Amino acid sequence: MGNTVTCCVSPDASPKAGRDRRVAERGEPYQTQVELQETDPGPHLQHISDRDFPSDFNDECNPSDHPQASTIFLSKSQTDVREKRKSNHINHVSPGQLTKKYSSCSTIFLDDSTVSQPNLRSTIKCVTLAIYYHIKNRDSDRSLDIFDEKLHPLTREEVTDDYCKHDPDHKHIYRFVRTLFSAAQLTAECAIVTLVYLERLLTYAEIDICPSNWKRIVLGAILLASKVWDDQAVWNVDYCQILKDITVEDMNEMERHFLELLQFNINVPASVYAKYYFDLRSLADDNNLSFLLEPLSKERAQKLEAISRLCEDKYKDLSKAAMRRSISADNLVGIRRSNAIIS
């Protein structure tokens, strides 16, 4: 009892010899057991999010995966923005009549674009402007054959030899993307996800978007985003009907390479999506692509509230459906109650 330690020793055996023998018998198996526990982790199923990436791959530097990393298109556009401001300052260019509207205590100006339901036309303009800055301020001309339009033309027209030397302007990129979105009836959210996949491809594959490959890279990103984001059946043959001269086999091969280069990482977290949306708005503000602002009225407030509730109910239904499909014993989010039988 208390601090007293007692032990029992066989009367016909020496205490010291017996103690040494028992220590020797128990010590070695115990050490072996410890070594086995340290070296054998046992059966363990690794989750896809726990995959080991190369040592030089820093997730925090990839804006398409990490919400705190700055988007590539916004950083590439800052060079031109600074040059425009410097040129206006040197040449004493007056901004002229102020067309930007500011809210006051009596009037609030809002546009019809929200993070949950962006304006389609304005979003496509901003996304294509981001692609334009990617091409204009690229670091080099690294590319892959699968995206080379000279090797895989989208039309029957012959591609000129100097095709890779002329950067497309913003209007050219906008017309190409707008045609695809109008024909396929895609949403504005799909345009934002397209830009996320595009920057993820450039980061993962270590390539640049340039005049020789921009159409096929954008087409592959739109194709993948439309299948992942939009809740509708999209087939590669649908895009072949829009782009008359491309074959289904070419579309399938490009999609397969695109997925492999993305390492099949098609996940877009909500925080990353929101970051791209607000950075696109900043890009629009820096380049005078302002959204159409209107005074907030009672009718507009009710409309915005209805849109928010509709999107909220939609996401709740999607999350409930996902929970029903993927619920498991180790992922219980609440207490599950069974119906009581009263007799």
Swiss-Prot record:
Keyword Nucleotide-binding (UniProt): no
InterPro entries: Cyclin-like_dom (IPR013763), Cyclin-like_sf (IPR036915), Cyclin_N (IPR006671), Cyclin_Y (IPR012399)
Alphabetical keyword list: Cyclin
Top-level lineage group: Eukaryota
Molecular-function GO term, any one: protein kinase binding
Pfam family, one: Cyclin_N
Descriptive protein name: Cyclin-Y-like protein 1-B
Organism lineage: Eukaryota, Metazoa, Chordata, Craniata, Vertebrata
